[in-house]
Design a protein with these regions (language model features):
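Active-site adenylate/phosphate-handling loop in enzymes that bind or generate adenylated species
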Residues: 131-133, 166, 172-178, 245, ...
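RNA-binding accessory domains that recognize and position tRNA/RNA substrates
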Residues: 1-182, 192-238, 307, 355-360, ...
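A conserved beta-strand->alpha-helix junction
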Residues: 228-255, 344
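A short alpha-helix-loop-beta-strand transition element characteristic
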Residues: 333-341
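Structural beta-sheet core signal
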Residues: 183, 207-209, 242, 287, ...
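Conserved G/P- and acidic residue-centered "switch" motifs that form tight phosphate/ATP-binding loops
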Residues: 188
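The feature marks non-catalytic terminal segments
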Residues: 340-390
Length: 390
């Protein structure tokens, strides 16, 4: 009996002539994710991914947990393979699913026969194996409408496979197939979720954090490093760009009207993000903005913020309720880190009465006393780059 992981891709099915590009990217991402775990054979055939241990040291359970988080995979299941013979398939089903069959009060058999040369139809094989299983496990009965257990058989060109229920995986599209984007990673609940959601659409991420030491502590920096590390379970390796932001914020406080502090700060963030994007082949900027959540996230405020960049600004959380964002944060494992009580740069010099309905002209006038280019260049020159691996 050969134990393996059987994975089915998601939206790759919808692709046309460039389908192979997405498949190759998915296989490469899976191999990269498995490399720290052990040696595995990864094969893509007939729109399915097969993962087998290449030696005794390879941990298939650890591989299951890792691959389930790879974007581009819709479902994953443990399976076993055998020759394409009805009796071999029956024998495998009896042994491989013995515990599940013993525990179940009812079951049914479903067959997918992609190899049409197999001499039995899908229904015939299901009936044959189902009859044999019912005889071997008298504790259970056949129930084709609402069974406790579904025994799944797949007859493919290279072998036959037996498994039970497939589990939902990460879904989405393979990271890297839709280009790259700079993503703002603050340390709160929202930005890790927005980063996750854009990566799920196949985008390679370059995370950027604006650090305002000593107004924010080294613990705040460590918090963001932890969030980036947690995200790599889905995104793969990334290089975190830590931007020194203290001088910019001090200059804003010194020279600009208080009600515009946050808006001017965010305009600087956009300028710096655009510069980072240009040096990392990124075609967009990702933010965790949520319409109306805070004063800087009104339509007028966001228009002022985005006015300084030529890149598209992607806002995956823009219409979501906070509770839905929190739900995703819990699911992907970033919530507990996000709520650690370490402030980020967005809480430094917060205006008492922020402008909520600004115009671009007003904000441009408010920041006109600053040497914008010099401040941006200084910040970019001081960037600390930290590679984040799995």
């Amino acid at each position: 009996m050969k134990d393996l992981l059987l994975c089915k891709p998601g939206e790759i099915f919808l692709k046309g002539l460039n389908k192979h590009y997405f498949e190759e990217r998915l296989v490469a991402n899976v191999k990269r994710r498995l490399k720290p775990i052990g040696h595995f054979r990864v094969t893509y055939l007939q729109s399915a991914l097969y993962i087998e241990a290449a030696d005794d040291a390879a941990d298939l359970d650890a591989a299951y947990d890792a691959v389930r988080k790879v974007f581009g995979i819709a479902t994953i299941t443990r399976a076993a393979a055998c020759e394409k013979d009805k009796d071999a398939i029956t024998a495998l089903a009896k042994t491989y699913l013995h515990d599940a069959m013993t525990a179940a009060r009812s079951f049914k058999v479903e067959t997918k026969r992609s190899d049409k040369r197999f001499p039995m139809t899908s229904i015939e094989l299901s009936q044959y194996v189902g009859g044999e299983l019912a005889e071997a496990f008298p504790n259970t009965v056949v129930d084709v409408h609402d069974p406790e257990l579904t025994v799944r058989l797949e007859v493919r060109e290279q072998a036959a496979y037996v498994h039970a229920q497939a589990v939902e995986a990460a879904g989405g599209m393979p990271v890297g197939c839709n280009g790259a984007a700079v993503t703002m990673l603050s340390g709160g609940i929202d930005s890790p979720v927005s980063s996750y959601m854009i990566a799920k659409r196949g985008v390679r991420l370059v995370p950027v954090h604006f650090f305002s030491f000593p107004y924010t502590s080294e613990l705040a920096k460590e918090k963001v490093l932890s969030l980036a590390k947690e995200l790599t379970a889905y995104t793969g390796r990334m290089t975190l760009q830590i931007v020194p932001f203290t001088h910019i914020q001090e200059e804003i406080r010194r020279a600009c009207p208080e009600e515009y502090f946050t808006l001017i700060m965010r305009r600087f963030m956009m300028r710096i993000a655009e510069d980072i994007a240009a040096h990392n082949e990124c075609k967009a900027i990702v933010t965790g903005e949520n319409l109306g959540q805070v004063a800087s996230q009104t339509m007028e405020a966001m228009a002022c913020t985005q006015d300084v960049t030529h890149l598209p600004v992607l806002q995956p959380l823009i219409g979501m309720d906070k509770r839905d964002i929190v739900k995703i944060a819990r699911e992907i494992g970033t919530f507990d880190t996000s709520i650690l009580p370490y402030e980020d740069c967005c809480t430094v010099f917060t205006p008492r009465h922020p402008k909520t309905r600004p115009t671009v002209a007003e904000v441009a006038e408010a920041e006109s006393a600053l040497d914008i280019d010099a401040l941006v260049h200084e910040a970019v020159d001081g960037i600390e780059r930290i590679r984040i691996d799995l």
